C-alpha cells in the first residue's frame, strides 16, 4: 500500500551531503538535473518507492504541491506549463500511481504540452514476470509510450542527467509533448558516479527556407479572400498573427487551444468558430487560408471529414508531419510560428511578394471595411445557429466576463457549458488565457488545472468552469486548493449527470441509461473540503459571488443549477 503524506504541500527534508560530491544517489542526480534546467516547481504524491526523490527537492530549490490524485498532479503540471511556457514536472510512485497519471499525459500529448513525468520503476534485474513486488508491472515504459513522446528507462545513475537533457531538448526544439523518465528502484537509492550536469542547449527558432517564404508571401499578396486559422502552435506569436491579419485585412478564426491569441473583440476576430457551419462554408470559399499551429482536427471542426477548402492552403507548423496530415499544405512552412510569421511579414513589407503578384497580373488592395463587415455577419450567423442550444448559458458567461481582469486565466472541462458555451461565447482579450482539454477530451481537467495555473501566476485571477459530471472526476482537489489558500472561483453548471451523453442517447432514440445522477450538494461538499460553497440562481447572483470568490484566500465553488440557467 502506498505511503502518502497528507499535507498538500508535502514534507520537505534536507539531504545529508554525500562524502564524495561526484557520487550521488539516483534520486539526487535527478533533482540536480531538474534544477540545472531551471525547474523550481514540481507536482506529485510521495509514496514508498519515490522517497529518495522527495528527500532532495527542498535542498535544490524545488517547491512542491501534492494534489489528492495523480491525475490532479498531471493536470496541474500541464496548466503550469501552458501558462508559464516552462515544462511542468510531475512525480509519481510506481505501478498504479503511474497509470493514474496516464490520462493527464495523454491530454498533454494531444495538446502539445511540455510535461515531464518521473517515476521509479522495477529494479534493473526484474524478470518482467510476476514476483509479488509492491506495485509490480511487467513494463511501465511500454504503457507510457502509448501516451507520451517517449519513455526513457535509465540503466545507471550517470544516465539520469542525459535522460533529463533529452526531455528538455524535445521541449525546446521540437513539437513539445510529454516525456516519461523511469528510474529503477535499485538505482534510485544507489550511490554511483553521477557525471557532470548535462543541460539541453537552447534551440534557435527554426525558419523555413527563403524560397518557401517567398512562395507563401506571393500567395498572400494576391489573395482576394484571405483567412487565418490559429491553433495552439501559434501561442507566443499572437502579435505577429494580428499584424499579418491587419496587413491582409484577413478575418481570423481560432481553435480551442488558440483561443484569445487575438483579442476576441477585435473587428477581424471570429473567435473559436471552426465548428460553425456558416464559418466552415465561408472558410472553404477563401482563395488563400493561412493555418498556423493547428491540426485542423475533428475536435475543432466537429466533423470527421476534412474541410473541403477550395483555395490554397499555407500551413505553418513546427511538426513536419502536420504538412501532410488531414489537409495537405499547398505551401508547407516548417518552423517556429513567430519566426516564420516575422519572415512572411518582412517579405510582404519589402514588396517582393507584391512584385511577383503584379507580374502575374494580380493587383489586390486589402479592404478592412469589407472584412470587418464580413466578420460581424459571420458571428451573427454562428450565434443564430447555436442560440436554441446555447442561449441559457450566455447571461452567466457575461457575468463571468464582467468579473474577469484582462489577464485572467480560465480553465475548463470537457463539458457542454464549456465547448458549447464558454469557448465560442466567453469573449477574452489577448492578455487572458483559456486552458481546455482538447482532442483527448479528458474529464476532470478544470479544477486541478486551475490549481496549477494559480501556482504559476499567483497574482492573476483564475476561474475554473465545469459541469457536475466532469467536476466529480477531480473534486477532491478542492482540499488541495484549500490547503494552499488559493483564491479560486470554481463555477459548476449542474445538470445532475452526463448531459452530453444523455442528449446523444435521446438523439439516437435510445432510452437514457446511466446518465442521470442523484443531485449532490456540491456547495456543502466544497465547505467540507475547507473551501466555500454557494449557489447562484441568476447571473446577478453569480457576478456578486465571483467578486468575493476572487479575493477570498480559499477555493469557492459556485453551483449554477441547470434549471436556473
What are these regions (language model features)?
Residues 3-7, 15, 185-211:
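Aromatic-enriched
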Residues 27-30, 35, 45-48, 53-58, ...:
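Active-site diphosphate/adenylate-binding microenvironment
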